[in-house]
C-alpha cells in the first residue's frame, strides 16, 4: 500500500472518531440543557452546513460537518 493511501485511511479514522465524540457530546448536552443550546449545536441538529462554518469553534467544526454530511442523520 502506498503512503498516500495509508495517510488517507488515517485521516478518515481520525475524522470519524472526532465526529463520533462531537455527536456524543451533543446528545449529552441536549439531554442536560434543552433550552440553552449554542448555535454550533443547533446548526448540527438542523443539518445546517453554513452554520457549522459560522458558529463552531475550529475543534468542533469537523464534528458538526460530520453530522451534517451523514446521510443517516441529515437526509
From Swiss-Prot:
Cysteine disulfide partners in this protein: 40-56, 47-74, 52-64
Function of the protein: Mating ciliate pheromones (or gamones) are diffusible extracellular communication signals that distinguish different intraspecific classes of cells commonly referred to as 'mating types'. They prepare the latter for conjugation by changing their cell surface properties.
Alphabetical list of CDD domains matching this protein: MER1_2_10 (cd23510)
GO cellular component, one term: extracellular region
Residue ranges listed under propeptide: 20-37
Protein name: Mating pheromone Er-10
Record note on quaternary structure: Homodimer.
Main localization, broad class: secreted
Compartment list: Secreted
Leader sequence segment: 1-19
Pfam families to which the protein is assigned, alphabetical: E_raikovi_mat
Keywords of this entry: Disulfide bond, Pheromone, Secreted, Signal
An MF annotation (GO) of this entry: pheromone activity
InterPro entries registered for this protein in UniProt: Pheromone_Er1_protoz (IPR016058), Pheromone_protoz (IPR009064), Pheromone_protoz_sf (IPR036245)
Transmembrane segments: none
